[in-house]
């Protein structure tokens, strides 16, 4: 049997780049909760003892940016300089201006356009992907790497492994076979975890705890065998972490946010962007389209692309490829997609309820992936049943 290896990585919520994504989306949540018409493009960067938020926000909301930064850092677990950042005593810098009036008139006519007329906030192309290899219709490599990261955070916060600190990375290599275009996982080849830890714990304890409390509950036993390789904190020491160890920036983990290297990516990041930014809303609706194709039994694997011009409501192109796994021709699937999904930005905001912020709605997306999540706030994961015409 001919097989191949493919790898996906993830980082957990204490990674500096992910900290920035979560701050940017916490600010988006706060703006949309008070003013659903908020126009938000919020970036965050961080380094030792400092977090800065900057960008363009036009909103009627009254937002305490500094409080949101400190609260978000504290929730993640950055409560002292020892762990990489002290939420209550770090410097918080804010440099936020209004959205450019040139963009405002072109996209939403200074809020005068009807929803179906609202143009894309920028040019760009986005991809959605789905595969039948997991119940989530997501790639197994990505699902396992992401769940390992989430479990690391869980056992840190519930004190199962009190030696853990917030920063950490995971990576999973899976051996696959190609079944006429569909991906079939055979086994997990390699598991890599690098996690920040305190000064007291031994490397043996780290390896033992990670196997028992993180790997065993996450990776199904059927995928593990005597040849599976484990690299557990292979650098030997990871005490200094978070923004103290590395600078962080919003939008630097776009593959972790999506499909772990499978499918394709148009390059646009998600966090800190309101739904007129098609980098985000466009990527969400093509995930829904691709997932619906697979869930409806029209293909075992599917990728959908959409593209936009700034200020123009209708997409420039929509593309579908089922990797030769389709039960009907791709051209017929494309017709079904165009009939069932409205790719105009204003209509995506309505149909996917994207103008609703607050209650961590967007902040939740900013760690552990935007897709394959079982949560009613992830409206783009709702399947539309697609039926070919008789």
Curated annotation (Swiss-Prot):
Residue positions annotated to bind Mg(2+) are: 9
Its transmembrane ranges are none
Q: Which UniProt keywords apply?
A: ATP-binding, Cobalt, Cytoplasm, Magnesium, Metal-binding, Nucleotide-binding, One-carbon metabolism, Potassium, Transferase
Q: State a single Pfam family of this protein.
A: S-AdoMet_synt_C
Kindly list the positions annotated as binding L-methionine: 56, 99, 246, 277
Which amino acid positions bind K(+), per UniProt? 43
Known EC number(s)?
A: 2.5.1.6
- Outline what the protein does: Catalyzes the formation of S-adenosylmethionine from methionine and ATP. The reaction comprises two steps that are both catalyzed by the same enzyme: formation of S-adenosylmethionine (AdoMet) and triphosphate, and subsequent hydrolysis of the triphosphate.
HAMAP family linked:
S_AdoMet_synth1 (MF_00086)
What protein name applies here?
S-adenosylmethionine synthase 2
Q: Tell me which species this is from.
A: Solanum tuberosum
